[in-house]
Amino acid sequence: MSEQRHSDDELAGFEAERARLREEHLRPPGERPASTARGVHHTALISSDVETTIRFYQDLLGFPLTELIENRDYPGSSHFFFDIGNQNLLAFFDFPGLGVGPYAEVLGGLHHMAISVEPERWDAIVARLTEAGVDHVVHSEVSVYFQDPDGARIELIADPLGEMYGTQVL
């Protein structure tokens, strides 16, 4: 994404709009109200093959499978969960016979999911991705981007929770 797709005037306009939105909506940490949420319970993606997904997320990435049940809304479909730490789950559905197409980035859809990992585990995970032949890109020496077997983009980031590339975001 390094190629410039907008004129300098357009880029200046985008930055001016971000500045306006920050001024109008962003409050200093001490002035922000407490969130009404307590965390992400789970994010659910679609799997084309349950076993391939289990092998990728549990065996390669080290996220333990915690449950595998029938999808209550679609008989025959599986709903399964992986522990991604801090009492957060990554869930999947499969939809056998539904003919779900390949992953596509769409407006309102998932761009990527960033999962926090301990810095001391990050290098080992990157090494396992390399060893398994998974194409990946390392960014800022704390973040690695890759696609899962169904094309969903995943980022594993070793920055502290609430921080991104040295910037406090929480």
Predicted regions and their residues:
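A short acidic/small-residue loop/turn micro-motif
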Residues: 97, 160-163
